Amino acid sequence: MDQRQRRILGQPLSIPTSQPKQKRTSLISFFSKVSWKLRFQKREPLKNVLFILAERARDPNANKRHTAMRGLGTMAREAPDKVRKHKKIVLDLLVYGLYDPVSLEVIHESMKTLTVVLGKIQGKGLGSFFIDITLQTRTLLDDENDSLRYSAFVLFGQLAAFAGRKWKKFFTGQVKQTRDSLLIHLQDRNPQVAKACKTTFRACSPYLKLRKEYSFQSEEDQRNIKLYRQLSHYHPEILQFFYANKIL
């Protein structure tokens, strides 16, 4: 993405900020969440909601695409069973948003929603989506925008917990290519990004071992991976809090 786009679209999505502009964005965000939550509480037919979200996810207007990503996040929280049932459609829309060619806000919202959705489905049945998500997330670890880097580290750490046997070889290669980024951002200029990086580094450390005698995977690391999975499924917001406060 060129510098002009980043100047226009990459202005602080920041991790927390108290600027007046953020308050206006938060207000719009609040009403958006309420709107989608009411739809699910009224039990509006899911196919209708998915149709609306699918249309908005591909709309030329970036604000509508952003709303679609947010709506999918609300769906994951309010109707996780439905998301599991229609996960291929949901994942397809989120990956589409993750690769948005213009809007950093759409990409950011997609990453946050993917963190919730992957937790609800416990990383099962991702198929080739695992590759798509991993490749794009890895490129965002070095993004100049603090919020994008933060969300990318959270999501990448989650992917480490869900790689499993099927994607172990692929993910090991991705982690090795990411090693420099992991080391650099341990000292990230943004303290919250640095904390998220440290937690993700621990989650990825088993994939960095070269020989058995240099294994990073202690008994504590194995317990942490199980804990990542449980929190990711039941309380993704707590998982993000732990990342932010270096509790794991």
From Swiss-Prot:
Residue ranges of region Disordered? 1-20
Q: Where in the cell is it found?
A: Nucleus, Nucleolus
Keyword NAD attributed: no
Q: Where is the signal peptide?
A: none
Q: Which GO terms describe its cellular component?
A: cytoplasm; nucleolus
InterPro entries, sorted:
ARM-like, ARM-type_fold, HEAT_Maestro, Maestro_heat-like_prot
First and last residues of every HEAT repeat:
44-79, 128-163
Read off the Gene3D superfamilies from this record.
Leucine-rich Repeat Variant
User: Per its record, how is this protein called by name?
Assistant: Protein maestro
What species does this protein belong to? Macaca fascicularis (Crab-eating macaque)
Name the gene that codes for it: MRO
